[in-house]
């Protein structure tokens, strides 16, 4: 299935889009922080703006994106959105060459808008083009591919912008990735529109309210959406905390951060693929809550491993190299916890995505995905704001966040218990 005409061009299309989003954003953050010459407070403020601009468009535009993906043939929209992305990347290249921060921030917002339009289309494509028995496998590949693209894009963005001629290389790679994604979009097979008579609501906020109401009227869809929101909030918190965790808790040089990013993404990918492998042999919905409980256990162990970290440099300003850290057994324990909790997250999120697509009305599946995106974005923002407030007031530290995350995971496991009786089509 993976290399079939109905899946592989689609995989290329979304993979390089997610890769580009995160390469662009992280390269811009590094450029602002290290190369802009701005005062630290102003540089930090613009970095936070950059981190938020990519997610902000999901709130107003997701519902309209869902309506468009239900009304029009999806192969046409794939091509239109990838043409939009390629056209955006041309000025991005020149803005990077000039080192123009504000134009890059504006272009990042437009890139986020393109991603918000693309996301419901991506997940609505799966149940339309794949057979029901392939839903679990398709979602496993999409989940693994998305997270690998996000992390590799982030790591490459952090690296490219710092090498000689880094701005030129960053802009050129972004343009090249957009071109590859565009080629993939034109290879996606033609398909009919699911709801051609649907009227597009021009009022963005009313449209958002309508798609949210339609999803929350259904108990199963509500459980899926809130369960997935926990996954994305947790993942966003880990990615945000890893740099500070490495510096302040492990006293490690910055080179450890991308390694932890890679371990986390590898864990999500492993869990996603493991889920579809098990799903070929037995029902996986009964395993969703146990996977979340295991995720909470590994998160608690990460908390205790960090609390017991005893390697502290003699010089308060010194940081340990990776070669020095690998001799410390606790680093291996922390690394294992990170991979295993990420694998549990990948495992439990795949069947929730598949069940959401399976249970939604075929004519409304893109709008159900749009509602999911809105709630996911809200959960990510809520988690970030709540954590920042708790840390700013000294209520918790970096390590204390792990306890909160573990508690949320455990409560979510209890909340998702009613889904254990649901069944997905199997091979």
Predicted regions, residues:
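Transmembrane alpha-helix termini and helix-breaking/packing motifs in multi-pass membrane transporters
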Residues: 27-38, 93-98, 151-174, 248-249, ...
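Small-residue hotspots at the loop-to-helix junctions and early N-terminal turns
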Residues: 40-48, 254-262, 370, 402
């Amino acid at each position: 299935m993976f290399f079939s005409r109905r899946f592989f061009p689609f995989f290329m299309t979304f993979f390089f889009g997610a890769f580009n989003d995160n390469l662009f954003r992280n390269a811009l953050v590094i450029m602002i922080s290290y190369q802009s010459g701005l005062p630290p407070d102003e540089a930090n403020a613009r970095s936070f703006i950059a981190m938020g601009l990519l997610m902000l468009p999901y709130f107003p535009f997701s519902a309209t994106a869902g309506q468009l993906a239900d009304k029009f043939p999806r192969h046409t929209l794939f091509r239109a959105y990838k043409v939009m992305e390629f056209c955006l990347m041309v000025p991005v290249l020149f803005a990077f060459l000039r080192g123009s921060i504000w134009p890059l921030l504006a272009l990042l917002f437009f890139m986020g808008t393109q991603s918000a339009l693309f996301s419901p289309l991506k997940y609505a494509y799966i149940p339309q083009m794949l057979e029901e028995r392939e839903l679990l496998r398709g979602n496993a590949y999409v989940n693994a591919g998305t997270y690998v693209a996000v992390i590799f894009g982030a790591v490459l963005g952090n690296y490219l912008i710092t090498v000689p001629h880094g701005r030129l290389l960053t802009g050129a790679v972004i343009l090249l990735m957009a071109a590859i994604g565009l080629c993939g979009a034109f290879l996606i097979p033609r398909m009919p529109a699911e709801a051609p008579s649907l009227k597009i609501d021009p009022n963005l906020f009313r449209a958002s309210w309508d798609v949210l109401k339609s999803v929350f009227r259904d108990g199963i869809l509500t459980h899926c959406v809130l369960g997935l929101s926990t996954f994305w909030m947790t993942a966003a918190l880990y990615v945000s905390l890893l740099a500070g965790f490495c510096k302040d808790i492990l006293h490690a040089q910055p080179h450890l951060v991308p390694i932890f990013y890679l371990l986390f993404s590898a864990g999500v990918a492993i869990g996603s693929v493991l889920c579809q492998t098990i799903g070929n042999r037995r029902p996986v919905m009964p395993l969703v809550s146990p996977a979340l409980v295991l995720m909470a256990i590994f998160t608690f162990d990460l908390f205790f491993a960090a609390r017991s970290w005893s390697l502290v440099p003699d010089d308060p300003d010194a940081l340990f190299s990776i070669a020095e850290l690998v001799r410390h057994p606790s680093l291996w324990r922390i690394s294992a916890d990170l991979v295993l909790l990420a694998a549990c997250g990948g495992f439990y999120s795949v069947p929730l995505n598949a069940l959401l697509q399976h249970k939604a009305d075929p004519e409304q599946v893109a709008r159900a995905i749009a509602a999911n995106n809105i709630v996911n974005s809200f959960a990510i923002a809520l988690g970030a704001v709540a954590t920042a407030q708790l840390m700013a007031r000294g209520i918790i530290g970096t390590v204390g966040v792990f306890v909160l995350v573990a508690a949320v995971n455990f409560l979510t496991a209890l909340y998702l218990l009613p889904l254990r009786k649901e069944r997905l089509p199997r091979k």
